[in-house]
Amino acid sequence: MGFTEGDGSFIVSTRGNLMFVITQSTVDIQVLHYIEQELGFGRVIKQGHKTSRFIVQDISNLYILIQLFNGNIVFPSKQNSFFQFVSHFNKLSNFPTVATINTLTLPTYYDNWFCGFTDARHRRGCFTCSLLGNSTVYRFRFLLAPVS
């Protein structure tokens, strides 16, 4: 979930088509192939020399993703785009109407959300260990830049 909140998008195109996309540097394309393999659907494409994407467009697999994400989103901005996505999905599909769960999840130290989000936002989050001055005292920190 955290990885998607960092680098994923729920897209409604100007034509009304639905698409779920996770974007990564082509250097990390193996992550996208791993997601494709674990889910058993979607496709990975290269977009230019530096960017690759994992894409899901078919309605039946979008329905599965909606079930996974519904009620499991942390950020209000991602939840808003998800709700718009689900609203369009309900209009387009023959699946039972999906009622969105209007609560935000709070990540804990005991789940993998922080790891996924930090990995996705590799330039905005990191773990550090440093020695303080000339002593043997060290400090561990988790740094995360603000999310817009």
Regions found by a protein language model. Name each.
Residues 1-148:
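Internal intein/HINT superfamily modules and their associated LAGLIDADG
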